[in-house]
Swiss-Prot record:
The keyword Ribonucleoprotein appears for this protein: yes
Top-level lineage group: Bacteria
Chain's gene name: rpsL
Modified-residue entries (3-methylthioaspartic acid), positions: D89
A Pfam family reported for this protein in Swiss-Prot or TrEMBL: Ribosom_S12_S23
UniProtKB keywords: Methylation, Ribonucleoprotein, Ribosomal protein, RNA-binding, rRNA-binding, tRNA-binding
UniProt protein name: Small ribosomal subunit protein uS12
Region described as Disordered: spans on this chain: 1-47
Segments forming a coiled coil: none
NCBIfam families: rpsL_bact (TIGR00981)
One GO BP annotation of this record: translation
GO CC term (a single one): small ribosomal subunit
InterPro entries documented for this protein: NA-bd_OB-fold, Ribosomal_uS12, Ribosomal_uS12_bac
C-alpha cells in the first residue's frame, strides 16, 4: 500500500480498457479485400456452417469477418466494408461484414430488420 507522499508524487494509474476491435484503428468501419471465403463450425453446444471471410484491411491487418444473413455473393478479391462486433460461438471472429455496401449484396427477400442486412424495401 502506497504512502500519502507516494500518491502525491505519482498518483493512481487508471486501468486501461482493452480494445475489442484493434484492427479498425479507432474508426467505425474499414474497407478491405477478401483473401479467402470459407465456412466454419461453431463452438460446443451449437452446430452449423457459419460463413466467414478472411479480409485484408486498408490498415494492413488481416482479420476474420462474419458474413451475416442467408446467402452471399462474396468471393476472393471482393471489396467489403468491415465493422466491429464479434460472433460469440466462433473463436477469433471479432468483426462483421456490412451487407449492401461495396461488392456485398443485401439479403434477398428480407422483410424485417432490413437495415441490418442492406435489403431494399419490398414493393
Amino acid at each position: 500500500m502506497p504512502t500519502i507522499n507516494q500518491l502525491v508524487r505519482k498518483g493512481r494509474k487508471k486501468a486501461e480498457k482493452k480494445q475489442s476491435t484493434p484492427a479498425l484503428k479507432g474508426g467505425p468501419q474499414k474497407r478491405g479485400v477478401c483473401t479467402r471465403v470459407y465456412t466454419s463450425t461453431p463452438k460446443k453446444p451449437n452446430s452449423a456452417l457459419r460463413k466467414v471471410a478472411r479480409v485484408r484491411l486498408t490498415t494492413g491487418m488481416e482479420v476474420a469477418a462474419y458474413i451475416p444473413g442467408m446467402g452471399h455473393n462474396l468471393q476472393e478479391h471482393s471489396v467489403v466494408l468491415v465493422r466491429g462486433g464479434r460472433v460469440k460461438d466462433l473463436p477469433g471472429v471479432r468483426y462483421h461484414i456490412v451487407r449492401g455496401t461495396l461488392d456485398t449484396l443485401g439479403v434477398e427477400d428480407r422483410k424485417q430488420g432490413r437495415s441490418k442486412y442492406g435489403a431494399k424495401r419490398p414493393k
